[in-house]
């Protein structure tokens, strides 16, 4: 409980920094889970650079982009009524999610040194499956998030749920 209160104080004092660091930490955790539980690499075969890349993506891309998106979305559709939460979820999942995945997957490819041609082929292969999988998880999560969670906690709530999603994304992005 003391850790949660410390997090709340830090979030109140430095919302943007804390949100970005939270996203980075949980993206890194998602990659660790992917490598250890999904891919079963073991500690000897764990790719630390990959984990650091995913954590960096969380801090440098996911945190700022998703955190910024939530602010824009709250400006476009203010309030937390059921109807507004539904509108936010539809805009998020119909507009933002497809664009986000379309940027995230190739960004991982670039950071992994893939050629433009290989990256494009991988995006064409993996994007439809990633987007469909997105729709199994995120509409319900986002509906609850937009209805029940204050704006400054949304990124943290999503990133906690996203530990599972990040594990999937890391696995999907690193499949050859």
Curated annotation (Swiss-Prot):
Swiss-Prot/TrEMBL keywords: Membrane, Mitochondrion, Mitochondrion inner membrane, Transmembrane, Transmembrane helix
InterPro entries assigned: Mpv17_PMP22
Site (Determines ion selectivity): 92
Top-rank taxon, per record: Eukaryota
UniProt key word Magnesium: no
Coiled coil regions, renumbered to chain: none
Biological processes, Gene Ontology terms: cellular response to reactive oxygen species; glomerular basement membrane development; homeostatic process; inner ear development; mitochondrial genome maintenance; reactive oxygen species metabolic process; regulation of mitochondrial DNA metabolic process; regulation of reactive oxygen species metabolic process
UniProt GO MF annotations: channel activity
A Gene Ontology cellular-component term: mitochondrial inner membrane
Main location: mitochondrion
Segments traversing the membrane: 18-38, 57-77, 94-114, 131-151
Membrane topology listed for this record: Multi-pass membrane protein
Pfam families: Mpv17_PMP22
Subcellular location: Mitochondrion inner membrane
Family assignment from sequence similarity: Belongs to the peroxisomal membrane protein PXMP2/4 family.
Record function comment: Non-selective channel that modulates the membrane potential under normal conditions and oxidative stress, and is involved in mitochondrial homeostasis. Involved in mitochondrial deoxynucleoside triphosphates (dNTP) pool homeostasis and mitochondrial DNA (mtDNA) maintenance. May be involved in the regulation of reactive oxygen species metabolism and the control of oxidative phosphorylation.
Designated name of the protein: Mitochondrial inner membrane protein Mpv17
Organism, scientific name: Rattus norvegicus (Rat)
């Amino acid at each position: 409980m003391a850790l949660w209160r410390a997090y709340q104080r830090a979030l109140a004092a430095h919302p943007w920094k804390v949100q970005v660091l939270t996203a980075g930490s949980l993206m890194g955790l998602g990659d660790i889970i992917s490598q250890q539980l999904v891919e079963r690499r073991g500690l000897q075969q764990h790719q630390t650079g990959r984990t650091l890349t995913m954590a960096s993506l969380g801090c440098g891309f996911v945190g700022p982009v998703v955190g910024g998106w939530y602010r824009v979305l709250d400006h476009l559709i203010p309030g937390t009524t059921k109807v507004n939460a539904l509108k936010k979820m539809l805009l998020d999942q119909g507009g933002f999610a497809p664009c986000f995945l379309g940027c995230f997957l190739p960004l991982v490819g670039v950071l992994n040194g893939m050629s433009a041609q290989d990256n494009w082929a991988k995006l064409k292969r993996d994007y439809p499956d990633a987007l469909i999988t997105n729709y199994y998880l995120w509409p319900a999560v986002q509906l609850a998030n937009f209805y029940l969670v204050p704006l400054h906690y949304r990124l943290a709530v999503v990133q906690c749920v996203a530990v599972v999603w990040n594990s999937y994304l890391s696995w999907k992005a690193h499949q050859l």
